A protein has these predicted regions:
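Short cysteine clusters
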Residues: 52-55
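Electrostatic cytochrome c docking/interface patches
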Residues: 22-48, 135-136
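Short, non-ligating residues that shape and space the ligands of small metal-coordination modules
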Residues: 27, 61-62
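Short, low-complexity, Pro/Ser/Thr/Gly-rich segments in the mature regions of secreted, periplasmic
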Residues: 129-135
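C-terminal motif of bacterial Sec signal peptides marking the signal peptidase cleavage site
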Residues: 17-20
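Bacterial N-terminal signal peptides that target proteins for export
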Residues: 1-10
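Extracytoplasmic electron-transfer domains, predominantly the class I c-type cytochrome c fold
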Residues: 36-38, 45, 63-128
Length: 136
């Protein structure tokens, strides 16, 4: 696990606090990239590549309207990931990398996502709002 330096930790805290003030709005692509170290535009493509759209409804991803897993609109504004992890960028990346390692009872499989791709996917997810298209 990577540890954040103090300035980055403060930036993450500030962004999370801003998100807590207005849970309906996702982050801008630039803020999401700074928060996660990933590329939200690449993350949108990786979501399809890894088949996330087969189980989840994901705004901005054509055809991602499945109802097996929870809908991901507004996930960046939720307090918890999968009901067990506080919603932080590092936890989001860890969850995307290997869900069963964090919750053996989860139905979400480990699909072999690389750390770089997990950061990109996390960046995209943090741009999602509560139902509207993500920022471009």
């Amino acid at each position: 696990m990577r540890w954040m330096d103090a300035p980055r930790a403060l930036a993450v805290l500030a962004l999370l606090l801003l998100g807590a003030c207005n849970k309906r709005d996702g982050l801008s692509s630039r803020d999401a990239a700074a928060l996660t170290g990933g590329d939200p535009h690449a993350g949108r493509e990786k979501i399809r590549e890894y088949g996330c759209d087969a189980c989840h409804t994901i705004p901005g991803v054509p055809g991602a309207d499945a109802l097996v897993g929870p809908p991901l609109a507004g996930i960046g504004g939720r307090m918890y990931i999968a009901g067990i992890l506080t919603n932080t960028p590092d936890h989001m990346v860890q969850w995307i990398l290997d869900p069963p390692a964090l919750d053996s009872a989860t139905a979400m499989p480990n699909v072999g996502v690389t750390e770089e791709d997990a950061r990109d996917i996390a960046a995209y997810l943090y741009t999602l709002t509560s139902g509207r298209e993500p920022p471009r």
